[in-house]
Amino acid sequence: MSEPSSRPLACLDANIFLAVLIPEATRAPKDEIAGSARVLKAVEEGRLRGVSTAILLGEIRYVYLREDKAGFEIARAAIEAESNLRVLTITASLAIHAAELRRTYYSKKNAFSYNDGLYLATGLAERADLLITTDPHLLSVANLKTLRPSQYR
């Protein structure tokens, strides 16, 4: 395995995990679901380092509840046990930066959410090489290179 610094660091949005965990609950096309599986496999194998924000777990939990699905605790344990993935606590500075990013990107035509701001703020704070998402609001940001999971090779 290569040195950690030589492997790209990707900030991962919840939709990457949800596409694999509960594909029937996502609006993502099949190529994005397959791409999400490739991304998570690369993290698991150590070819890609991942980082996300603790809101990830809240978003995943919500979908499990909304879809009335069992298995959240198993998914959570797997995420928390993954050695190539860091899930950051939401600190005051991260929360404030997320609000500032929301102010920058939100408009009537772009419903950039506070959660979107948390993912972007996390990626920027951790100096991620890219942010992988299917969210059109995040794919249009200028602060960080973004990639659809289907584009990850």
Predicted regions: what is each one?
Residues 14, 54, 113-117:
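Conserved glycosyltransferase catalytic-site signature
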Residues 17, 57, 95, 138-139, ...:
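A generic structural signal for short hydrophobic patches within well-formed alpha-helices
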Residues 19-21, 63, 141, 149:
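Residues that scaffold the ATP/ADP-binding catalytic core of kinase and kinase-like folds
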